Swiss-Prot record:
Gene Ontology terms: biological process: translation
Species, as recorded: Mycobacterium sp. (strain KMS)
A single cellular component GO annotation: cytosolic large ribosomal subunit
Protein name per the record: Large ribosomal subunit protein uL11
Gene name of the record: rplK
Sequence similarity: Belongs to the universal ribosomal protein uL11 family.
Record-linked Gene3D superfamilies: Ribosomal protein L11, C-terminal domain, Ribosomal protein L11/L12, N-terminal domain
CDD domains per record: Ribosomal_L11
Amino acid sequence: MAPKKKVTGLIKLQIQAGQANPAPPVGPALGQHGVNIMEFCKAYNAATESQRGNVIPVEITVYEDRSFTFALKTPPAAKLLLKAAGVQKGSGEPHKTKVAKVTWDQVREIAETKKSDLNANDIDQAAKIIAGTARSMGITVE
């Protein structure tokens, strides 16, 4: 078994799927850890090609020999809610002004997608977490 590599950094970014490039925010974040930026961009774009149009969070683990591994997460709940509601952005004053409505079925569908990243034991709990996010964005859940 190979000796374990020493981790020197953990970088968390949210990048459009299939559109990572060396420009900010990707370049500076990776550059300060000495990672080969183009190598990451090519690997990320290849891994997220099928999900174009979504923002995909990524966790990059950097090792002392400047190599890296990355793990893709599910799109942020807020982005999925905006897409389901068909609006560009949430409300500026969420508890006064409501901008859209989503059904419980849509919330459950988003919860199914996000299940692996949420701290919930079953779909009902996950749906409540997503509904809370919707409420704080000024989206009504019916």
